[in-house]
Swiss-Prot record:
This is Putative N-acetylmannosamine-6-phosphate 2-epimerase. Keywords: Carbohydrate metabolism, Isomerase. NCBIfam families: PRK01130.1. It comes from Staphylococcus haemolyticus (strain JCSC1435). InterPro entries: Aldolase_TIM, NanE, RibuloseP-bd_barrel.
Length: 223
Protein backbone atom coordinates (compact mmCIF):
# COMPACT_ATOMS: atom_id res chain seq x y z
CA UNK A 1 0.00 0.00 0.00
CA UNK A 2 1.12 3.53 -0.72
CA UNK A 3 1.91 5.43 2.49
CA UNK A 4 0.31 8.74 3.40
CA UNK A 5 2.28 11.74 2.25
CA UNK A 6 3.84 13.29 -0.83
CA UNK A 7 4.48 11.33 -4.01
CA UNK A 8 6.69 13.07 -6.56
CA UNK A 9 6.07 12.49 -10.26
CA UNK A 10 9.40 12.20 -12.07
CA UNK A 11 8.62 12.33 -15.77
CA UNK A 12 10.13 13.97 -18.83
CA UNK A 13 8.74 13.35 -22.30
CA UNK A 14 10.97 12.97 -25.40
CA UNK A 15 10.57 16.65 -26.35
CA UNK A 16 11.65 17.89 -22.89
CA UNK A 17 15.24 18.86 -21.94
CA UNK A 18 15.46 16.41 -19.01
CA UNK A 19 14.28 13.36 -20.98
CA UNK A 20 16.57 10.61 -19.68
CA UNK A 21 16.11 7.59 -17.43
CA UNK A 22 19.35 8.52 -15.65
CA UNK A 23 18.15 12.06 -14.95
CA UNK A 24 14.75 10.82 -13.74
CA UNK A 25 16.47 8.39 -11.37
CA UNK A 26 18.46 11.26 -9.85
CA UNK A 27 15.29 13.37 -9.66
CA UNK A 28 13.68 10.52 -7.72
CA UNK A 29 16.69 10.36 -5.39
CA UNK A 30 16.40 14.10 -4.72
CA UNK A 31 12.67 13.68 -4.02
CA UNK A 32 13.43 10.83 -1.61
CA UNK A 33 16.03 12.92 0.20
CA UNK A 34 13.47 15.72 0.46
CA UNK A 35 10.92 13.47 2.16
CA UNK A 36 8.80 11.99 -0.65
CA UNK A 37 7.10 8.70 0.26
CA UNK A 38 6.67 7.49 -3.32
CA UNK A 39 7.43 8.17 -6.98
CA UNK A 40 5.22 8.26 -10.07
CA UNK A 41 7.14 7.43 -13.24
CA UNK A 42 6.60 6.87 -16.96
CA UNK A 43 8.06 3.90 -18.91
CA UNK A 44 9.62 0.63 -17.84
CA UNK A 45 13.11 2.03 -18.52
CA UNK A 46 12.66 5.01 -16.18
CA UNK A 47 11.14 2.84 -13.45
CA UNK A 48 14.02 0.35 -13.56
CA UNK A 49 16.54 3.21 -13.30
CA UNK A 50 14.61 4.80 -10.43
CA UNK A 51 14.47 1.51 -8.52
CA UNK A 52 18.28 1.38 -8.68
CA UNK A 53 18.40 4.69 -6.76
CA UNK A 54 15.51 4.53 -4.27
CA UNK A 55 13.46 1.87 -2.52
CA UNK A 56 10.26 3.94 -2.50
CA UNK A 57 7.02 2.50 -3.92
CA UNK A 58 6.49 3.47 -7.56
CA UNK A 59 3.25 4.30 -9.36
CA UNK A 60 4.04 3.22 -12.91
CA UNK A 61 2.50 4.40 -16.15
CA UNK A 62 3.34 4.13 -19.82
CA UNK A 63 2.28 7.05 -21.99
CA UNK A 64 1.68 5.96 -25.57
CA UNK A 65 -0.54 7.45 -28.27
CA UNK A 66 -2.97 5.30 -30.24
CA UNK A 67 -4.71 6.41 -33.40
CA UNK A 68 -8.40 7.06 -32.92
CA UNK A 69 -8.17 7.24 -29.13
CA UNK A 70 -7.50 10.03 -26.63
CA UNK A 71 -6.50 7.48 -24.00
CA UNK A 72 -2.71 7.48 -23.66
CA UNK A 73 -1.95 6.56 -20.03
CA UNK A 74 -1.44 2.77 -19.82
CA UNK A 75 -4.02 2.28 -22.55
CA UNK A 76 -3.70 -1.46 -23.32
CA UNK A 77 -2.40 -4.77 -21.97
CA UNK A 78 0.87 -4.12 -23.83
CA UNK A 79 1.65 -1.22 -21.48
CA UNK A 80 0.44 -3.22 -18.49
CA UNK A 81 2.89 -6.03 -19.33
CA UNK A 82 5.76 -3.53 -19.49
CA UNK A 83 4.82 -2.17 -16.07
CA UNK A 84 4.52 -5.61 -14.50
CA UNK A 85 8.05 -6.34 -15.80
CA UNK A 86 9.28 -3.07 -14.24
CA UNK A 87 8.36 -4.27 -10.76
CA UNK A 88 6.38 -1.15 -9.87
CA UNK A 89 4.06 -1.48 -6.87
CA UNK A 90 1.10 0.36 -8.42
CA UNK A 91 -0.10 0.51 -12.02
CA UNK A 92 -2.05 3.64 -12.95
CA UNK A 93 -4.30 3.75 -15.98
CA UNK A 94 -6.71 6.10 -17.69
CA UNK A 95 -10.13 5.36 -16.20
CA UNK A 96 -12.07 7.99 -18.15
CA UNK A 97 -14.98 7.38 -20.52
CA UNK A 98 -12.91 8.38 -23.55
CA UNK A 99 -12.72 5.95 -26.50
CA UNK A 100 -10.19 3.25 -25.73
CA UNK A 101 -7.80 1.76 -28.35
CA UNK A 102 -8.26 -1.89 -27.40
CA UNK A 103 -9.44 -3.52 -24.16
CA UNK A 104 -12.24 -2.08 -22.05
CA UNK A 105 -11.36 -0.62 -18.66
CA UNK A 106 -13.01 -3.58 -16.93
CA UNK A 107 -10.98 -6.03 -19.03
CA UNK A 108 -7.72 -4.26 -18.16
CA UNK A 109 -8.49 -4.32 -14.44
CA UNK A 110 -9.29 -8.05 -14.65
CA UNK A 111 -6.07 -8.63 -16.65
CA UNK A 112 -3.94 -6.96 -13.97
CA UNK A 113 -5.69 -8.78 -11.10
CA UNK A 114 -5.16 -12.13 -12.84
CA UNK A 115 -1.60 -11.60 -14.03
CA UNK A 116 -0.19 -9.59 -11.11
CA UNK A 117 -2.43 -9.95 -8.03
CA UNK A 118 0.28 -8.39 -5.85
CA UNK A 119 0.19 -5.11 -7.82
CA UNK A 120 -2.24 -2.36 -6.80
CA UNK A 121 -4.19 -0.36 -9.37
CA UNK A 122 -4.83 3.39 -9.59
CA UNK A 123 -7.56 5.03 -11.67
CA UNK A 124 -6.78 8.35 -13.33
CA UNK A 125 -10.17 10.07 -13.60
CA UNK A 126 -11.60 13.45 -14.64
CA UNK A 127 -15.22 13.39 -13.37
CA UNK A 128 -17.13 12.25 -10.31
CA UNK A 129 -18.97 9.68 -12.45
CA UNK A 130 -15.66 8.18 -13.56
CA UNK A 131 -14.53 8.03 -9.93
CA UNK A 132 -17.71 6.17 -8.94
CA UNK A 133 -17.26 3.74 -11.85
CA UNK A 134 -13.64 3.10 -10.83
CA UNK A 135 -14.83 2.45 -7.29
CA UNK A 136 -17.30 -0.14 -8.61
CA UNK A 137 -14.42 -1.80 -10.48
CA UNK A 138 -12.55 -2.06 -7.16
CA UNK A 139 -9.56 0.13 -7.99
CA UNK A 140 -7.26 0.47 -4.98
CA UNK A 141 -6.71 4.18 -5.57
CA UNK A 142 -8.63 6.88 -7.41
CA UNK A 143 -6.64 9.90 -8.57
CA UNK A 144 -7.89 13.23 -9.89
CA UNK A 145 -5.07 13.19 -12.45
CA UNK A 146 -7.08 13.95 -15.59
CA UNK A 147 -9.37 16.71 -14.29
CA UNK A 148 -9.17 19.41 -16.97
CA UNK A 149 -7.35 17.14 -19.41
CA UNK A 150 -10.33 15.42 -21.06
CA UNK A 151 -12.37 17.15 -23.76
CA UNK A 152 -15.41 17.28 -21.47
CA UNK A 153 -13.54 18.77 -18.48
CA UNK A 154 -11.43 21.27 -20.42
CA UNK A 155 -11.31 24.63 -18.66
CA UNK A 156 -11.68 23.05 -15.22
CA UNK A 157 -8.82 22.78 -12.77
CA UNK A 158 -8.48 20.81 -9.54
CA UNK A 159 -8.20 23.78 -7.19
CA UNK A 160 -11.19 25.75 -8.55
CA UNK A 161 -13.98 26.59 -6.09
CA UNK A 162 -11.80 25.64 -3.13
CA UNK A 163 -11.21 22.06 -4.40
CA UNK A 164 -14.95 21.40 -4.72
CA UNK A 165 -14.40 18.53 -7.19
CA UNK A 166 -11.92 16.76 -4.91
CA UNK A 167 -14.31 17.11 -1.96
CA UNK A 168 -17.09 15.48 -3.98
CA UNK A 169 -14.86 12.58 -5.05
CA UNK A 170 -13.84 12.02 -1.42
CA UNK A 171 -17.50 11.96 -0.44
CA UNK A 172 -18.65 9.54 -3.15
CA UNK A 173 -16.04 6.74 -3.19
CA UNK A 174 -14.71 4.13 -0.78
CA UNK A 175 -11.32 3.69 -2.46
CA UNK A 176 -8.33 5.69 -1.26
CA UNK A 177 -8.26 9.05 -3.04
CA UNK A 178 -5.07 10.55 -4.45
CA UNK A 179 -4.95 14.27 -5.22
CA UNK A 180 -3.09 14.79 -8.48
CA UNK A 181 -3.07 17.46 -11.17
CA UNK A 182 -2.23 21.12 -10.59
CA UNK A 183 -1.30 20.84 -6.94
CA UNK A 184 1.31 23.51 -7.51
CA UNK A 185 2.15 25.05 -4.12
CA UNK A 186 2.99 23.74 -0.63
CA UNK A 187 -0.15 25.52 0.59
CA UNK A 188 -2.30 23.53 -1.86
CA UNK A 189 -0.61 20.33 -0.73
CA UNK A 190 -1.47 21.13 2.89
CA UNK A 191 -5.06 21.96 1.90
CA UNK A 192 -5.71 18.66 0.10
CA UNK A 193 -3.99 16.74 2.90
CA UNK A 194 -6.30 18.39 5.42
CA UNK A 195 -9.29 17.40 3.26
CA UNK A 196 -8.42 13.76 3.87
CA UNK A 197 -6.76 12.42 0.72
CA UNK A 198 -4.64 9.29 1.17
CA UNK A 199 -1.67 10.90 -0.57
CA UNK A 200 -0.84 13.60 -3.12
CA UNK A 201 1.11 13.43 -6.36
CA UNK A 202 3.03 16.58 -7.32
CA UNK A 203 4.93 16.66 -10.58
CA UNK A 204 5.60 19.77 -12.62
CA UNK A 205 5.85 22.10 -9.61
CA UNK A 206 8.84 20.08 -8.37
CA UNK A 207 10.42 18.26 -11.31
CA UNK A 208 9.87 20.37 -14.43
CA UNK A 209 12.27 23.36 -14.30
CA UNK A 210 11.14 24.62 -17.72
CA UNK A 211 7.55 24.92 -16.48
CA UNK A 212 8.66 26.46 -13.19
CA UNK A 213 10.77 29.05 -15.04
CA UNK A 214 7.84 29.89 -17.33
CA UNK A 215 5.60 30.45 -14.30
CA UNK A 216 8.06 33.01 -12.90
CA UNK A 217 8.33 34.79 -16.25
CA UNK A 218 4.56 34.91 -16.71
CA UNK A 219 4.10 36.40 -13.24
CA UNK A 220 6.26 39.39 -14.16
CA UNK A 221 4.73 39.82 -17.61
CA UNK A 222 1.14 39.96 -16.32
CA UNK A 223 -0.16 43.48 -16.24
Amino acid sequence: MLPNGLIVSCQALPDEPLHSSFIMSKMALAAYQGGAVGIRANTKEDILAIREEVSLPVIGIVKRDYEGSNVFITATSKEVDELIESGCEVIALDATTQTRPKESLEELVHYIREKAPHVEIMADISTVEEAINADHLNFDYIGTTLRGYTSYTKGHILFENDFEFLKEVLEKVNAKVIAEGNVITPEMYKKVSDLGVHCTVVGGAITRPKQITERFIEAVQQK
